[in-house]
Structure formats: C-alpha cells, structure tokens
Amino acid sequence: MYNQVLHDHLDGGLRPSTAKELAKRTNYKPINNVDDVANFFDRSSSTSLEDYLEAFTHTIALMQSYSNLEQIAYEAAADMHQNNINFYESRYAPFYSVNDNLSPKDVITAINSGFKQAENQFGIVSGLIVCGMRHDPDNVKAVAELAIEHKELIIGFDIAGPEFNYLPSMYKDSFLKVKNEGINITIHAGEGDGVHSIQEALDNGAKRIGHGVRIIEDISDDNELGPTA
C-alpha cells in the first residue's frame, strides 16, 4: 500500500527524547525533560492558533545548527516510515534557523540531507515545502525569492503563521512569481480566519489548503476543492 503524508510541520514533530538531548547539548533551559516538550504541545487543545504557535518557539530554538536540522529531518522521515508512510512532505520556515553559521540555503540543504539519509536507509521519499511567515511580509517575499533561487531543492511554497488580518491576497505578488517558476503553492487558510481566506488562497494559486477547518461554516466553495485539497 502506498501511504502519503502531505501536511506536516518539521518543527512540530521532534521526538521528545531528541528535544531533551538537543536542549542539553545547546544549554536550552526551558526543556529539561521529555515532559516539558509534551506540556508545550498540550496547547494543541487551545482554541487560539496564536497560543498554539507560541509552543513552536521552543522547538525552533533547537533547530539552529546544521547537524541538529539534519538529525531532526532524518528522524521525522524515519518516524513516518515506522508508521508505514512511503511519501512525506514536510514544511519549515527556513529563516527561523538562519544565523551567523547557517545561510538560508544551508538550512534547506541540512534538512534535505536528513531526508536523503532516511530514504537511503528506509526507502521513504521526502520533500521540503518552504514557508513564509505571513505576519512578516518581508519574510514572505524573501522565502519566495529563496524558493525560486533554489527550486531544485524544494517541492513547494507555503505561508503559515497567524491568519487573522493576514489574508493571502497581501502576498499576491510573491505567489505570482513563484507560480510563474512552476513551483507548487499551498497556503494555510481557514483556521485562524474564516472561509473567505480559503477562497483567497484558491484565488492566489493554492493547489492545496493547509488545515481549512472552517470550510464547514460555508460549503459554497466545495466545488473549487480538488482531490489534493
């Protein structure tokens, strides 16, 4: 059987044991044991997308070196394999890991290296979708340019982060540039904002909607949603 995971966040899937290991290695104080990691992500039951996203600051803090990124990507793909997944698409906001020792391309390369190691060992095929953060228009523009410059290293372009007041149409120029380069577009919409944001995502070239749970509020757009929605 051919099983696929098409929506996953690399910074949301660290093994608790790895988070503890990397926190100790990097002297990151908020994480001292595996329970700390679980407590951060218990926020998934929160009704606030913003509160939930805050938990990711702790995992991103551990993704600041080539070796850490490589390990996390490898383990993410390996864990997918253990769950009988053959094809895995993961997304990450690369500029969250850019620092004096890591360029944006280094971040992408490290993640792809981890994916390739898992592919060589287990046969699972993985690909990276790069995310722009919608509350920072300059970041969205920079990630779009990065995607175009290194389109051979990625499989898609996305925007993520807080949705309210950050509609997809704000970034239409970036979406158009990416689309013109033949890069697939997926957009987070219809969670922190209403169904109108899903329609905007479709209007701006999205082939797939991230989350989209509020479509239930208005199913008038259902004919626009295809098999990859």
Regions found by a protein language model. Name each.
Residues 1-183, 190-197, 202-203, 207-208, ...:
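Metal-cofactor-binding active-site regions of metalloenzymes
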